[in-house]
Each structure stands twice: as structure tokens, then as C-alpha cells.
């Protein structure tokens, strides 16, 4: 399955919530009717079955992190192998992706932009260039903008935008140096309450 290249707001409308696929310069509800699904019959909200609700939640989380189905299923399998709560393990694995950490640190306005920075070798981890978006960042890893990429206008703009947002407590960021430290593994209380990971576990457990 190819990566989705269509209108980003359409996906947020489909899920009925902001998937943070746009930069956030303007509130998403000023751009579209977030509570109305796209299409001719978008105003109608059909009652979902249990399976439908589970599928929608999986699609929502998959789209938030920009991950294809096969890769998402592999993350679930890994989360299920780990000790502890499978749903929480899944979210921790997704949060530990390098492209997500770059986004969370404010070096990119969206996860898609962060993925591009990583792929274009603009990111270093512990002083070494890493160009794999799915690379798992570990505790105490230092993630930084590569020296030759620090003058990019979009990175500076993203950092300015990030100053207006609440910073994740599990990361430590030095905006002036354009680097940050992955201080600790995020806890469930640190992450979005709008995600019902238990529905994803129920879906894949069948």
C-alpha cells in the first residue's frame, strides 16, 4: 500500500479529530468542519459496530504517526512481546520513532516534515547521521540538527512555532543549539488522552 498523498485535512475530517498533519499555524477548525466527514453524506454519523470502532481507532493512530499497515502491525507484535500493557507499549514504540522525536522536539512542524528531514540526512543521533525515520531513539540519546542544515528556514520557523506549544516533559530541548535529549520513556499520562489504544489491542487480538 502506497503512502497517502492526498489532502491532509480530509483525513482529520474522516477521523473527526485533529491528526496534527498540518503545521498548526492556524487552528484546524478554521480551515474545515472537523466534525463533519468528507463527502456528500459527511454530515451523517452512522453508528459503528464494535469492529468498526476498533478499526477507526487503528486507522486514526496509524495516520497520526504516518505509518503503513504492515509496519503498524509489526509494531503491535513487538508491543505484545514486551512486558506490561500492550496498548501502552505500542504508543511508547511509536513515540520513540526518530521522526516522531524530531517532531516532538519542535525541529519540524509536522511528522511528515520530520520524516523528510530524517530521510534527507539533516538529523544526527549521538553525533552520527541517521536517515531512517523508524529508528528507535533510546533514553539519553542526543538528537540534533546536522550543522549544515541549521540554516534551513523551515527548521527555524518550526522552532518558533514550538515555543508557543507545551513541551513534552520526557524531552529536553535546547532550541539555540538545535538539539535535544530523550530523557525518559514517556508514560501513558504524558500522551494524548484522545487515543483509545485498548480498541487497537482488541482489534488485533481477534
Swiss-Prot record:
Pfam families: Ribosomal_S4, S4
GO MF annotations, alphabetized: rRNA binding; structural constituent of ribosome
Keywords from the named record: Ribonucleoprotein, Ribosomal protein, RNA-binding, rRNA-binding
Record keyword Ligase present: no
Keyword Transmembrane helix: no
Gene3D superfamilies named among the record's database cross-references: Ribosomal Protein S4 Delta 41, Chain A, domain 1, RNA-binding S4 domain
Any one GO CC term of the record: small ribosomal subunit
Residues annotated as domain S4 RNA-binding: 96-156
Coiled-coil intervals, chain numbering: none
Gene Ontology terms: biological process: ribosomal small subunit biogenesis; translation
PANTHER family in UniProt: 30S 40S RIBOSOMAL PROTEIN, SMALL RIBOSOMAL SUBUNIT PROTEIN US4M
Subunit structure: Part of the 30S ribosomal subunit. Contacts protein S5. The interaction surface between S4 and S5 is involved in control of translational fidelity.
HAMAP family documented for this protein: Ribosomal_uS4_B
Role noted for this protein: One of the primary rRNA binding proteins, it binds directly to 16S rRNA where it nucleates assembly of the body of the 30S subunit. With S5 and S12 plays an important role in translational accuracy.
Similarity remark: Belongs to the universal ribosomal protein uS4 family.
Name of this chain's protein: Small ribosomal subunit protein uS4
